[in-house]
Amino acid sequence: MIGLAPKEADVVDSIPPGYFGGNIDNWRIGKGATMYYPVAVPGALLSAGDPHASQGDSELCGTAIECSLTGTFQVILHKKATLAGTSLASLDYPLLETQDEWLMHGFSYANYLQELGEQAQSTIYEKSSVDLALKDAFRKMRAFLMNTKGLTEDEAISLMSIAVDFGITQVVDGNWGVHAVIKKSIFAGAVA
């Protein structure tokens, strides 16, 4: 779990992930990976925990091979004013970049703290849906391809149909997750 503080609440349940990151439970977040998060509060308030020695997609039974964590993390703050024209300019969700892929994280509710109202932190456990998470991952990947690769909506959807893999990230953390993966090599040699 790596995330930042959301702006909607002073105290937040650490189990459901959201636009701020948190308990995303994507095993690809590890050595050599880069995570990008939108900063919602002054100071960002980064937190990390719940490391796994191994985990498959879905974390189906609610746990992975839990372990302690000792690591070196590099935190880089990208000021919003410097992001114009980059893939991070309109980022409002956790984005994972590996050496070979970009991954968008979709959730049942992109911002459950806002969307589900006053009781959101308990309601999220009753309202999660893989269908909703898939729709969110689809929307995020479509926007990513249009905004960062200059594709039309039709081009983005066509490319997603042949080159984007969707997987269930987790179905145990309240705000269920689906990730959309596209290989960077698809764009090798592309002229913008």
List PLM regions with ranges.
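Phosphate/adenylate-binding glycine loop and adjacent helical scaffold
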Residues: 5, 41, 49-68, 75-113, ...
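Generic beta-strand/beta-sheet core signal
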Residues: 38-40, 76-78, 159, 181-183
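C-terminal alpha-helical interaction appendages
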Residues: 112-192
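Short, charged beta-turn/beta-strand-edge "cap" motif at the junction between a beta-strand
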Residues: 40-45, 166
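Solvent-exposed alpha-helices and their adjacent loops that cap or buttress functional pockets
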Residues: 27-30, 65-67, 137, 170-172
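Long, compositionally biased low-complexity segments
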Residues: 20, 27, 31-39, 69-71, ...
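Intrinsically disordered, low-complexity linker/loop segments enriched in Gly/Pro
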Residues: 1-30, 36
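Short, glycine/acidic-rich beta->alpha junctions
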Residues: 16-21, 55-56, 137, 152, ...
